[in-house]
Every structure is written in structure tokens, then in C-alpha cells.
Amino acid sequence: MPESNLTKKAIALSAKELTKEKPYDKISISDIADRCGIKRQTFYYHFQDKYELLVWIYFNELFAPNMEDISLENWDEKLGAILTQMQEEKKFYINTIKHAEDYIIQYMLEVAEQTFEEAIDKLDEKSHLKNEERGIFARFFAYGICGIIVEWAKGGMKMAPEKLADYMREMLEKCKQAVYILSLIHISEPT
């Protein structure tokens, strides 16, 4: 593993440890650098600010490992794995969602919207939807799922991750059925 990645992981670990002691918005770059045993300049060599670090952690530790090979058939299992990992590191994820909410939500929305756009493309092979409609549907589902995850985290992650993922799968299945029924109605309508 390149030295740069080792340093980034050490910085990330230090930030995660600090979230057990105080809110993320109260953690300074100096706090992270001191905990990691590096100079502030070293931190800034790797990250622009603590929010870029946070996005790096979410991407490299939560999303990238769990989103690999995601498909329409397994997305709920992948979501369950993400939620389980969040629950295993509950203090970190609750802290960062509560105290860096804008940054985290924006990042989660970008990841979710891209994932849903790809899923909609696969579902709508015959191109019944216009690009504008695809974007709206993708944003609708991205905001819904991200909102549920944020509320789940803020509420203390009380519901089991698998149960929450199952609820989301059921909801999306019902939406998919509704879209199918509407498409049949649309096809059978006289013009």
C-alpha cells in the first residue's frame, strides 16, 4: 500500500477516535494532527479540510467496499451491509451525521442519485422515460433513502439494519409495480 494511503488511513483513524470524545464540528485540524502525530501541513498535503477527510472516510470505508458489483438484484443486501457497518461504528456515524450533516447528506445524495440513475437505465431499457424524468426519479429515490438513513442515525440506529433495508426494498418494489401498472395504462390508452 502506498505511503500516501497509509497516512490517509492514520489521519482517518485519528479523526474517528476523536469523534468518540467530542462533536465533529468541534474537532480541529490541530486535534487530528496531534492525535495522529503529524504536522498540520501533512494533514493539508492529503486533505483540503476536515470535511474532505470525512467524505474520504465515507467513500473508502463505507461506500466503495459495499457498492462493488451492486445490481438490481442485490442492492438491498448492499444497503444492509452499509447500515450494518454504520451500526458497528455507531458513535462515529451518528456524530458525523449530526455535526457535519450538510456535507454528509450532500455526499450521500450524490452517491445514491448516481446509483439510482444507473438502476433506472437498466429498468427502462426501452427508453420510455425522458432524461429529465430519469433525473427526477433518481433524485426522488435518493432523497428518500438518504433521508431515512439520516433519520435512522439521528434516532440512535434502533431498528435492525436488515429490517430497515427490507422496508426500503419493499417500498421500492411497490413503486416499481406502480410504475409498471401506469405504463400498461399508458400503453392501452387510445391516442
Task: Annotate each predicted stretch with a short phrase.
Residues 101-126, 132-147, 177:
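Amphipathic alpha-helical packing segments from all-alpha helical-bundle domains
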Residues 67-95:
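Hydrophobic alpha-helical connector segments
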Residues 1-22, 26-27, 31, 185:
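Basic, helix-initiating cap at the start of DNA-binding domains
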Residues 11, 30-35, 43, 86:
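Append "Primarily bacterial transcriptional regulators
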Residues 132-155, 159-175:
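Hydrophobic alpha-helical segments that form the core
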Residues 185-191:
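Conserved small/polar residues in nucleotide/adenosyl-binding loops
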Residues 11, 26, 38, 49-54:
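Short amphipathic alpha-helical segment with a characteristic S/N-K-E followed by hydrophobic residues
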Residues 37-47, 145:
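Short hydrophobic/aromatic patch on the recognition helix
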